[in-house]
Swiss-Prot record:
Organism: Drosophila melanogaster
GO annotation terms (biological process): locomotor rhythm; NADP metabolic process; response to light stimulus
Gene: cu
Region listing for Disordered, in residue ranges: 50-87, 611-642
Entry protein name: Nocturnin
Inducing or repressing factors: Nutritional conditions, such as food deprivation, and higher temperature during the larval stage increase protein expression in the adult flies. Levels of expression at the pupal stage are phenocritical for the cu-dependent wing phenotype. In the dorsal neurons DN3, a subgroup of clock neurons, accumulates rhythmically with a peak around ZT12.
Length: 642
């Protein structure tokens, strides 16, 4: 290799190869045609182009002269035999009469060239196959059809024009759905909200009129975000195997320890300060009757309440390390702030300083680390990965990402849990859910907690897909929880104006409310809203926080609410919620940053578990494992428990 070539390759780096010569046409790639590299490349990089350099490469060998009859290896030409096969072709066809008549004069004696020209320019309908059986014709047709179908799919998924046509068609379908609902007298869950892409409530919709997209399009949508064109790298969660923590550390001591580890002897920016929406005690450092921690150097939040039937829930998308560092494109976040060595200790601080009883996490791809650290503080965890996590298509991944639930073992007892891969129109998607039944050790009362992470990306089709995932989620949690009080939380990737929000709040099977929307309301107003479903959802939507995620990516700045904590109002009383930092606190570069490890903010809610009503039942029927204590509950078919 000459010096020019070597220099060019060095400039491109080890992952990217320089493109020399002409590119092979897409049709040739679909036909699996092998090209001769000698016909494409030049070693005289930087030299003047020759006259032949602008000519397209020859994908088929065309001989200038036919073999002489006097040669020993001469065989009479037989155009019915295959001496130059295409993929999917079993025979050599005779050129059609048009090509024989209109062929240029210099090609008259070159039958192979005329034959190739005919195959390129003419369809099979104008040529008569020779010497083929019916079975051969059928197989050739099927193979040609597969090629045409592959080209059509590629065009359908990449064409901007066709994408607009599909979205326009979906808009008409949504309008048709609403017209049918009105004609049939089906009440819309949000009849006073102009969505443009609304949908009926999950469990009460008219199934026989539901739109179901073509299966090919559906499979494309549910897998969108997984890098299927790249090789899959099935790594396991092993990057934190060497983690060693001092034994017997209390929570304050552990927080101080991780602060020192994060700084490495150098002072680092402190975690963002946050407060609760309702005022707490004036002196947060008083430990009389409360398990409060002296955390003013970290945050001004108070630890979990000590009343026997109070529950503190922390919901958080912690940002997958693999995706955040290698794929999500946080253009304003310093590279060092995205490293796992920096982020993991901030994640621990954000969780432990709030002292939650139940922790629900999404985008977890370092479960062993959390299991080790939180396990030292008497938490136990359940993890369920995505079936086709996009992390697995990125080099140096730490295994798949998924959802996790942790619970405080000295306060709560695991009675059973279940996991599910959410389905969309009876097709498994790439999103998952976990549900767990927990029992209060102090009173014996039970409640269920469920978490999920719905499909990301914008657009009417994806909003409809999320809504269908929500319907399947409702069926799953209702079957598991029965009449037990329910906490349903997660990253729903949908703003309140999307159909999934109304689907969950308007579902008569669950009768849920939104914790952050209800926290400042009177108890009576929550239990008796005096409004129909549409008005109830509209009011709740307006009371949601302005944002739960605030980030800057390559495509622009995103600031919206897509994370929620839903609860059963008649059995759980919302007492307080952790507020979100203001824009000036976050900084102009937004999140993630040196002061916050994720692009989502954690949601922290305090609930009081109420005694059952006269018509209610303390525990409902549901699926999952049952046992007397958490050590007797084994892992489900898909999940893992530690």
């Amino acid at each position: 290799m000459d010096q020019k070539t070597t220099g060019l390759r060095e400039n491109y780096g080890h992952r990217r190869q320089p493109a020399l010569g002409k590119a092979m046409p897409v049709t040739a790639l679909l036909l699996n045609l092998e090209s001769n590299p000698l016909d494409y490349s030049r070693n005289d990089i930087g030299a003047e182009l020759l006259e032949d350099d602008d000519k397209p490469p020859q994908l088929f060998s065309v001989t200038d002269e036919p073999p002489s009859p006097n040669e020993e290896d001469y065989k009479p030409p037989n155009h019915h035999e295959d001496d130059g096969k295409l993929a999917g072709e079993r025979h050599r066809e005779i050129p059609c009469s048009n090509c024989l008549k209109t062929a240029p004069g210099h090609l008259i004696d070159r039958q192979s060239a005329i034959n190739e020209m005919c195959q390129r320019l003419c369809g099979p309908e104008c040529r008569r196959p020779q010497g083929l059986t019916l079975d051969g014709v059928r197989q050739d047709f099927l193979r040609q059809y597969e090629i045409a179908e592959a080209v059509a799919k590629t065009s359908a998924m990449t064409s901007t024009v066709q994408m607009k046509q599909r979205l326009a068609a979906r808009k008409l379908e949504f309008e048709k759905e609403m017209e049918m609902d009105e004609q049939l007298g089906v009440a819309s869950p949000r009849n006073d909200i102009n969505l443009g892409q609304s949908s009926t409530v999950a469990a009460t919709g008219m199934g026989e009129f539901e739109f179901e997209p073509p299966r090919d399009l559906l499979l494309y949508l549910v897998r969108m975000g997984s890098f299927n064109s790249a090789p899959k790298i099935n790594n396991v969660d092993s990057q934190d195997d060497g983690l060693v923590l001092p034994s017997g550390l209390s929570t304050p001591a552990l927080l101080q320890h991780v602060q020192q580890l994060r700084g490495g002897g150098i002072e680092q920016p402190s975690l963002l300060t946050r407060g609760f929406l309702k005022p707490l005690l004036a002196d947060e450092d008083v430990a009389d009757g409360l398990r409060c921690l002296k955390l003013n150097s970290v945050s001004r939040v108070c630890s979990a309440p000590v009343e026997g039937d109070d529950i503190r829930l922390l919901q958080w998308n912690i940002l997958s390390q693999t995706l955040g560092q290698h794929n999500d494109g946080f253009v304003r976040c310093p590279e060092e702030a995205l490293t796992w060595e920096h982020r993991k200790y901030l994640i621990v601080q954000e969780i432990l300083q709030n002292q939650p009883d139940v922790i629900c996490l999404q985008e977890v791809d370092h479960f062993k680390f959390l299991q080790t650290v939180l396990g030292s503080q008497n938490y136990a965890g359940i993890f369920f990965p995505k079936p086709d996590s996009p992390c697995l298509y990125i080099e140096q991944n730490n295994g798949p990402d998924g959802c996790a639930i942790f619970y405080k073992r000295d306060k709560l007892q695991l009675q059973g849990y279940d996991t599910r891969i959410l389905e969309v129109w009876r097709v498994q998607s790439n999103q998952v859910a976990i549900a767990a039944r927990l029992r209060m050790r102090s009173s014996g009362r039970e409640f269920c907690v469920a978490t999920t992470h719905l499909k990301a990306r914008h657009g009417a089709l994806l909003a409809k897909l999320r809504n269908e995932q929500g319907r399947d989620l409702i069926r799953f949690v209702k079957q598991f929880a029965g009449d037990t009080p329910l906490l349903l939380c997660g990253d729903f990737n949908a703003e309140p104006v999307e159909p999934i929000y109304a689907t969950i709040l308007g579902c008569d099977l669950l009768r849920l409310g939104s914790a952050y929307a209800d926290v400042k309301l009177d108890r009576e107003e929550i239990l008796h809203p005096n409004a129909d479903v549409g008005e109830f959802v509209a009011k709740s939507m307006k009371r949601e926080p302005p944002y739960t995620t605030w980030k800057i990516r390559e495509e622009g700045e995103e600031c919206h609410t897509i994370d929620y904590v839903f609860y059963t109002p008649d059995r759980l009383k919302i007492k307080n919620c952790l507020d979100f930092p203001a824009g000036e606190q976050i900084g102009k570069n937004r999140t993630p940053s040196f002061q916050y490890p994720s692009d989502h903010f954690s949601l922290v809610c305090d609930f009081e578990l109420l005694p059952p009503t006269e018509n209610g039942k303390e525990s409902g029927s549901g699926s999952g494992s049952d046992g007397e204590n958490e050590t007797e509950v084994e892992g489900s078919k898909h999940g893992s428990i530690q």
